[in-house]
Regions:
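Juxta-kinase regulatory segment immediately upstream of eukaryotic protein kinase catalytic domains
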Residues: 1-32
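ATP-binding pocket architecture of kinase catalytic cores
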Residues: 34-136
Length: 136
């Protein structure tokens, strides 16, 4: 069994076992969960209910040696929220009660994998927009 499949029941149990009253977009919903993608440092699952589509990210490592890696990602996404160039973060849990590392729930942005030859100009424009975002 691969890591994505191994964590899938835990993701489902987490979604069912938590009271989501503090996260308005998730309140009172029953979610479908499907593996989305695995990176070097995160496992990503698409969660959906009706027209709502989100990403449930399980942190599994860090390249910058941070114990609070998922909180760091959440805060970075919060800072970029106004840019419109990054997914909106909705929830972070770094308590480590259900997962050895933290989890993050964020907006799902549809698209295709980056093709450097085809997408370099668009990627450069996106990075320029991100770098122009004012932060407090």
């Amino acid at each position: 069994m691969d890591r994505m499949e191994e964590f899938l029941p835990r993701v489902r149990a987490y979604l069912v076992g938590r009271d989501w009253t503090d996260v308005p977009c998730m309140r009172g919903r029953t979610f479908e969960v499907a593996p989305l993608a695995q990176g070097e440092y995160n496992l990503n699952y698409r969660i959906s209910a009706g027209g709502l589509r989100l990403v449930f990210r399980v942190n599994i490592g860090t390249q910058i040696q941070r114990r609070d890696q998922i909180v760091y990602e959440y805060r970075a996404l919060k800072l970029l929220e106004r840019s419109g160039a990054a997914p909106r973060p909705y929830f972070v849990d770094d308590s480590r009660r259900r997962f050895e590392t933290g989890i993050l729930i964020m907006e799902f942005l549809p698209g295709a994998p980056l093709d450097y030859r085809r997408d370099s100009a668009a990627a450069a424009a996106l990075f320029a927009r991100i770098h122009q975002t004012e932060v407090p």
